Amino acid sequence: MKDKIRVLWLCNAIIPQVSEKLNVNTGTGGGWLNQLSDIFDKRDDIELCIVAPFLQGDELAHITFGNKSEFYGFPKKIHEPWIYDDSVEEVFAKILAEFKPDLVHIFGTEFPHTLSMVRAFNNPDKTIIHVQGIISAIAKHYTAFLPEKAVKRYSFRDFIKRDNIEEQQDKFALRGEYEIEAIKKVRHVFHRTEWDEAVIKGINPAVCLHYAQEMMRGSFYSGTWNYEDCEKYSIFISQGNYPLKGLHIMLEALRSVKELYSGVKLYIAGDDILTVSSFKEKIRESYYSKYIRRLIIEWDLTDNVEFTGPLSEEKMRQRYLKSNVFVSASSIENSSNSVAEAMLLGVPIVSSFVGGCTSLIEHGVNGLLYQADAPYMLAYYICEIFQNKDFAKSIGKKEVEKARMLYDKELIVENILQTYKEMLET
């Protein structure tokens, strides 16, 4: 065994500590990889190189960060994620020749550059993919529980971009083709749930699966939901800007909940689609947003729905803690980070029974599961939480216990490092 493991990570976005050094804004993503890279950077037995898209430049960027880690930011000639960019393979070949990794660890399969790295490295036994969402499977569920007219119609923005809901699903399927080829070409995959195990084995029966969870954002490991401090009869949903997240199902359930709790309030993280007024806002609006706004107005839910705007990590944490119940209404999820964050804080959860949710939630013990196309059952379970505070407290307590085991940072690091060592020994 070598004294030091040279590992190259391929990530979908620049991690925060690198973006700060490059003085670029890359949004709020990559938090757990920021934590993991910081841990690896401080270890004497790891030499780390991170590779990620650098969309702010036209040339290959190369810097050092932390104590001794390296970063390469690669440009793209083609920015549409459903089109394969051959030039990326050439750039990766150059990076690989310079860094000379023992192992390549690819985070996510959602973009074609995953396949580019698999092809460029061309060493299946020393390549491991860390699946997040599995886009080839997700594509099949993209339009779930939507009427056909909503799937096929266009807003002005959709027409110009050729990007209505049906076309979005087609693009997911195209991206899924690159994902499938990448998974077929590697020997090792990190997974988190029974669902992703089934999907990955269906793609590549010979693959070696290794279990490793993801760390959650740091602030979610502190603070605990308290029934007495929450806003009674309030619901929180962390995303709703595209069909997979099931906001249309949540709104249908909200109609029923309102019959029993007229003051119920649904908080939705993200931009406020109820106040689209300027010409610029109107021409940039998707048909799904227009559809959601129409449902809210038609079902007389305007006073019961509030869009929070984009939330920072701390504001998101506070929104969880203030809520009476957290809902995940997705038509498919692998291992929802939003559910994980709610679990760590102990916020009572009602989730659709889809994908990998049963690897996180045991119905009636540390959450409630409803049939994904049954908004009346979602409404029923929300009301169960509202009317039974002892049950809500019990669920919240069990969630924290489960989450502390699943998202233990030291255990996650141990699992990843052990897998690296096993890969080097074969």
Show where each model-derived region lies:
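N-terminal subdomain of nucleotide-sugar transferases
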Residues: 1-58, 67-70
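Conserved donor-binding/catalytic core segment of Leloir-type glycosyltransferases
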Residues: 8, 226-245, 251-258, 266-267
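Short alpha-helical donor nucleotide-sugar binding micro-motif in glycosyltransferases
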Residues: 96, 310, 318-323
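Membrane-proximal helix-turn-helix segments that form the acceptor-binding/catalytic region
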Residues: 151-188
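Nucleotide-activated donor-binding/catalytic signature segment of Leloir-type glycosyltransferases, i.e.
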Residues: 280-310
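Aromatic "clamp/platform" in nucleotide-sugar-dependent glycosyltransferases that forms part
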Residues: 331
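Short hydrophobic beta-strand element within catalytic cores of glycosyltransferases
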Residues: 348-351
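Conserved acidic donor-binding segment of nucleotide-sugar-dependent glycosyltransferases
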Residues: 363-364, 368-375, 384-389
